[in-house]
Amino acid sequence: LQYPADLKSCAAVNSFLKDEKDIYFLDSAYNTEEFLSLIGNFKLLLGMRLHALVFAAVMKVPLLAISYDPKVDAFVNTAGGVLAGSVDDIKKEQLVNVLKAAWCKPPVVQNERMEQLRSKAQLNLERTFALLRGEE
């Protein structure tokens, strides 16, 4: 959530899902630790902002993205999340169907991809420190 700029978009999505229960929207500003803690308790995250999607992936929370930028598409594909559609043309029925499908499916691919990304990040870190020590 880019607070307060995204509140209007959240209200629009909420109007699509008004008959659904157990769906909550964050409508306040949070620091990084609070945000990670909140997301870690989610059963599912529907988001547009890259940082929210990254936090969901890190916390092993199934993520669905509404894309507004190629960087979101790239991250979702890399992380094994689900792209629900584009902000320019997503429809209510499409969003609800994707949400319902994701709700019933564990994020196996997402978790596998995140483990691969963690391993690659660790390898890059080790190589960086080796270079700094003059070992490579």
Identify the residue ranges that each predicted region occupies.
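Active-site anion-handling motifs in enzyme catalytic cores
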Residues: 1-136
